[in-house]
Amino acid sequence: MTTHLGQPGRPRGLVGWIVGRIMRRHNRPDNVWTLSLLAIGDGERALEVGFGPGDAIRLAAEAAPSCRIAGVDHSATMLAAARQLNRVFIEQGRVRLSLGSVDALPFADDAFDKVFSINCIYFWRDPALGLGELRRVVRSGGIAALTVRDIERAPYDAYRPDTLARLMTEAGFASVVIHRNGVPSHPLACVLGTK
């Protein structure tokens, strides 16, 4: 099921650039919290699907100085914004960003230790296919994390945490667990699973 939300779903042009700046500020707590649960370590390889303006990638690169991070997003506008934000890490060879889709990730099997997506599953054309791709590119014993707003209204209600946990289990992830941030003013859930 795809939820089309206009500019937030695929930011483009000047308006998309502005939307990206707003998303960067608004999603900062989501990024920080998800990365704290995922705990990307030095020397690990991580992938973010739907990186938007690139804030989570930057935070991860800053927190683990020898990690390698890749990102895929389907918005050329967000790719440009994320490249600008992560320019130093790209020049160091620690970050690699590309235009693409969760439906066909441009990476080899078992390429990453950790994979994550924050507030993006709402825009996936086929969540089961996307989760299968995440499982394909994460190594055995690796972890996948999907963070969503823990809200019971559209469009967020389509991917409630229990639904996400079921979808991850059906995609072949094990030890699937739901974490909630416990912040009533900004409720989030992160579903973690192991390959």
Question: Where do the protein language model's features map onto the residues?
Answer:
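Conserved alpha-helix/loop element of class I SAM-dependent methyltransferases that forms part
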Residues: 25-44
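Class I SAM-dependent methyltransferase SAM/SAH-binding core
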Residues: 45-104
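Helix-to-beta-strand junctions that scaffold the AdoMet/dcAdoMet cofactor pocket
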Residues: 64, 124-125, 138-139
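A short acidic, Gly/Pro-enriched loop at the edge of an enzyme's catalytic core
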Residues: 103-114
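A short SAM/SAH-binding and catalytic strip from SAM-dependent methyltransferases
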Residues: 114-126
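A short glycine-rich, Lys/Arg-flanked "PGG" loop and its adjoining helix->strand segment in the class I
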Residues: 128-140
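Conserved beta-strand signature within the Rossmann-like core of class I S-adenosyl-L-methionine
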Residues: 141-149
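Core SAM-dependent methyltransferase catalytic element
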Residues: 183-195
